[in-house]
Amino acid sequence: MTHASALGLTQHIPDTQSERDERHLAIQRVGVKEVRYPLTVRIGEQLSPTVASWSLDVALPAEQKGTHMSRFVAWLDALSASGKPLDATALRDELAVMLDKLHAVEGRIEARFPFFIRKHAPVSGVSSLLDYQGAWIAEHRAGSGTTVWCEVVVPVKSLCPCSKEISDYGAHNQRSHVTIRAELMEPPGDRRRPPPPGGGESTRERPVVDSAVELGFEALVRFAEASASSEIWGLLKRPDEKWITERAYENPKFVEDLVRDVALRLNADARIGRYRVEVENFESIHNHSAFAVIERE
């Protein structure tokens, strides 16, 4: 068989997923998940390469049998190959590109990945990287517009106020995780970018801010670290260990204190809309964790 004849046969392969469906059931979300693909994220002023676990989906009308599954990966490959750094503004734009490629009016992108921030120890100033978990989530729904969320998981140190109060010396302390999921809002009056296909902007302020004032991972990390008994570092010298031990002892926090203090910082930032903050203490005197959650809708 010649290449030309093989090409001719390919052109007549039926496209089953594009057929009409008669069951009259729309699908809210259909797509691919747990797709590992490289990307570049913007952390402050730095561009950081990483590998993300992607979940991509669109809404499917009742009359359409299936979506274009291969186009999700095609879109993702093009994004990765472009080298474009992913921040909130870029994510919003890329969601519109994905929806157009799949001929969809609603859809969602979620990318979860590790990232690093270089930190300097509090006394010695020695430099090292600390790893965090981050996520970008963007969703467009007809009638409510586009929302973009930034999520971080920040490791910190907490020390128990009760243990300090009742003990002659020392107090139990542990590593804690602060998880912040924040909706990024754009400034009032900024309406320069058109909505993705399907329209339907909400009467609420559309999420995502201009790049000059955009809030990202580094700011959310600082909200968590500044609220803890002490932040932590990847590399420390003895004077640094002394400083952290004494800093935590002088700044005890219950899990309730920590989650409230983080929430207060989020409340004070006009760039943040809805949010969810969860703190988990990996209790050093128990074989279980303590946790607290605050949500703003």
From Swiss-Prot:
Pathway: Cofactor biosynthesis; 7,8-dihydroneopterin triphosphate biosynthesis; 7,8-dihydroneopterin triphosphate from GTP: step 1/1
Record keywords: Hydrolase
EC number: 3.5.4.16
GO-annotated molecular function: GTP cyclohydrolase I activity
One of the GO BP terms on file: tetrahydrofolate biosynthetic process
Chemical reaction(s) catalysed: GTP + H2O = 7,8-dihydroneopterin 3'-triphosphate + formate + H(+)
Region Disordered, annotated ranges: 1-21, 180-207
InterPro entries assigned to the protein according to its UniProt record, in alphabetical order: GTP_cyclohydrolase_FolE2 (IPR022838), GTP_cyclohydrolase_FolE2/MptA (IPR003801)
Pfam families registered for this protein in UniProt: GCHY-1
Top-level division of the source organism's lineage: Bacteria
Annotated site residues (May be catalytically important) in this chain: 160
Function: Converts GTP to 7,8-dihydroneopterin triphosphate.
Entry similarity comment: Belongs to the GTP cyclohydrolase IV family.
The name this protein goes by in its record: GTP cyclohydrolase FolE2
Organism lineage: Bacteria, Pseudomonadati, Pseudomonadota, Betaproteobacteria, Burkholderiales
